[in-house]
Amino acid sequence: MSDIAIEFDDVVAGYGDFMILNNLSLQAKRGRITLLLGPNGAGKSTVLKTLFGMLKVRSGHIRLHGQDITGANAKDLLVKHGIAFVPQGRNLFGQLTVWENLELGGITLGMKTTHARIPEVLARFPRVKERLNSAASMLSGGEQKQLEVGRALLLRPKVLLIDEPSIGLSPMVVADVFKLLRQLADQGTTVLMVEQNVKSALKMADEAIALESGRLVMHRQADELLADPNIERLFLGGAHQAATPPSTGAASAAGIL
């Protein structure tokens, strides 16, 4: 069995007529944490959204564990292929309770299975467990992010896509989230993530892929890259000029890239 979980082969994808991924080819290994790096607009979040079926593949192929999933929709990717996606920002139903948000996260499983799995998820997030009857909007930023991750874990995903998990969180909560991701990978889950705190993320990641203008420019072991004295110049602002989408239409929002 191949150790390659995710494979992009000359993928072109984007928003409307504006292509962000330009014949992108990359691979991510099974049971590893692969970190996507690059300046704003390089295509990091676009990779996740394309893989999760939220953006149309204009050309090229995407394979998961050797199976061509090009063109599959998000529901099929979630239910049939075991891909879960935790997007950037807060994506909860604020007026609903923690318990109700978890129930909705498991809607494709059926309530019996969902209720059986919720205690398993809550065991990973004791602070969230204490707030089961609270509205999601009343949770702290860290608790909300933990709830989002927990909701994804209800599905016992084979592949977890996570976009900027540290935004708005305290260093202590970020450390907890990174520790959980490391545990999941060690247990066999493939994690593909985008993260602004490059150095912290590299410390717990296995591999790193750098993008520029929707193309792969580097794929290295995370520990090797962490030791590179040029890391800050390369990935914390300065070395590359990224593509900038048009100012009109949905692609104008910086958060989508």
Place the predicted regions along the sequence by residue.
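ABC-type ATPase nucleotide-binding domains, specifically the catalytic core motifs of the NBD
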Residues: G16, T34, K56, L96-A116, ...
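The feature captures the beta-strand-to-loop junction immediately N-terminal to the Walker
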Residues: L37-P39
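Helix-to-loop junction immediately C-terminal to a conserved catalytic motif
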Residues: F52
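Conserved ABC transporter NBD signature motif
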Residues: G60-I69, V79-H81, T114-E120
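Conserved ABC ATPase signature
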Residues: A135-L139, E143
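ABC ATPase C-loop
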Residues: A152-L153
